[in-house]
């Protein structure tokens, strides 16, 4: 077996999502740096691993995957006997985790990623942050966080009282937003604030910074 390989960029939120899952499972892996600024993700040999030209790509021996949330689910299930449990096998828990992943991927991440782009990445590229876009996206994020605040008033984490993939998937975007004025949206909601402090302090999360 060739072992686990992750092809990605350390600053990519999608790549970090996979790395956090691997660290939660205490798994050894090889990280292959794909330089985004040089367009390596749009060329061979990376395109062979992900025809859509997005990081990360993943290999576990002969098994190949792309799309970060598919990769984390594979890691959580295939290595269920390793490290920390990130999923549950109960029917209702499975459904709850699936719902949480859908909400994160369709409601939280698109908005959060736009805010990261405007406030973190654009300045790095010498571009100007569009304050109007930031205001619009913060209003959208506030609505998502209101849903999270209600949910976290009922359980310690988003899917249950245990840390799962639902929580893990939010960490990379949150890590970036904590260094921006958008942090106020987390701080204004007590349950969300406590949850953010909890999940971002996990050893696995600290290892990707």
Curated annotation (Swiss-Prot):
<dbReference type="GO" id="GO:0043295">
    <property type="term" value="F:glutathione binding"/>
</dbReference>
<dbReference type="GO" id="GO:0005634">
    <property type="term" value="C:nucleus"/>
</dbReference>
<protein>
    <recommendedName>
        <fullName>Glutathione S-transferase F7</fullName>
        <ecNumber>2.5.1.18</ecNumber>
    </recommendedName>
</protein>
<feature type="domain" description="GST N-terminal">
    <location>
        <begin position="2"/>
        <end position="83"/>
    </location>
</feature>
<dbReference type="GO" id="GO:0000325">
    <property type="term" value="C:plant-type vacuole"/>
</dbReference>
<dbReference type="InterPro" id="IPR040079">
    <property type="entry name" value="Glutathione_S-Trfase"/>
</dbReference>
<dbReference type="GO" id="GO:0050832">
    <property type="term" value="P:defense response to fungus"/>
</dbReference>
<feature type="domain" description="GST C-terminal">
    <location>
        <begin position="90"/>
        <end position="209"/>
    </location>
</feature>
<dbReference type="Pfam" id="PF00043">
    <property type="entry name" value="GST_C"/>
</dbReference>
<dbReference type="GO" id="GO:0050897">
    <property type="term" value="F:cobalt ion binding"/>
</dbReference>
<feature type="binding site">
    <location>
        <begin position="67"/>
        <end position="68"/>
    </location>
    <ligand>
        <name>glutathione</name>
    </ligand>
</feature>
<dbReference type="InterPro" id="IPR036249">
    <property type="entry name" value="Thioredoxin-like_sf"/>
</dbReference>
<dbReference type="GO" id="GO:0005829">
    <property type="term" value="C:cytosol"/>
</dbReference>
<dbReference type="GO" id="GO:0005737">
    <property type="term" value="C:cytoplasm"/>
</dbReference>
<keyword id="KW-0963">Cytoplasm</keyword>
<dbReference type="GO" id="GO:0046686">
    <property type="term" value="P:response to cadmium ion"/>
</dbReference>
<keyword id="KW-0216">Detoxification</keyword>
<dbReference type="Pfam" id="PF02798">
    <property type="entry name" value="GST_N"/>
</dbReference>
<dbReference type="InterPro" id="IPR034347">
    <property type="entry name" value="GST_Phi_C"/>
</dbReference>
<comment type="function">
    <text>May be involved in the conjugation of reduced glutathione to a wide number of exogenous and endogenous hydrophobic electrophiles and have a detoxification role against certain herbicides.</text>
</comment>
<feature type="binding site">
    <location>
        <begin position="41"/>
        <end position="42"/>
    </location>
    <ligand>
        <name>glutathione</name>
    </ligand>
</feature>
<keyword id="KW-0808">Transferase</keyword>
<dbReference type="InterPro" id="IPR036282">
    <property type="entry name" value="Glutathione-S-Trfase_C_sf"/>
</dbReference>
<dbReference type="InterPro" id="IPR010987">
    <property type="entry name" value="Glutathione-S-Trfase_C-like"/>
</dbReference>
<dbReference type="InterPro" id="IPR004045">
    <property type="entry name" value="Glutathione_S-Trfase_N"/>
</dbReference>
<keyword id="KW-0346">Stress response</keyword>
<dbReference type="InterPro" id="IPR004046">
    <property type="entry name" value="GST_C"/>
</dbReference>
<comment type="similarity">
    <text>Belongs to the GST superfamily. Phi family.</text>
</comment>
<dbReference type="GO" id="GO:0005507">
    <property type="term" value="F:copper ion binding"/>
</dbReference>
<feature type="binding site">
    <location>
        <begin position="54"/>
        <end position="55"/>
    </location>
    <ligand>
        <name>glutathione</name>
    </ligand>
</feature>
<feature type="binding site">
    <location>
        <begin position="12"/>
        <end position="13"/>
    </location>
    <ligand>
        <name>glutathione</name>
    </ligand>
</feature>
<dbReference type="GO" id="GO:0009407">
    <property type="term" value="P:toxin catabolic process"/>
</dbReference>
<dbReference type="GO" id="GO:0004364">
    <property type="term" value="F:glutathione transferase activity"/>
</dbReference>
<dbReference type="GO" id="GO:0005576">
    <property type="term" value="C:extracellular region"/>
</dbReference>
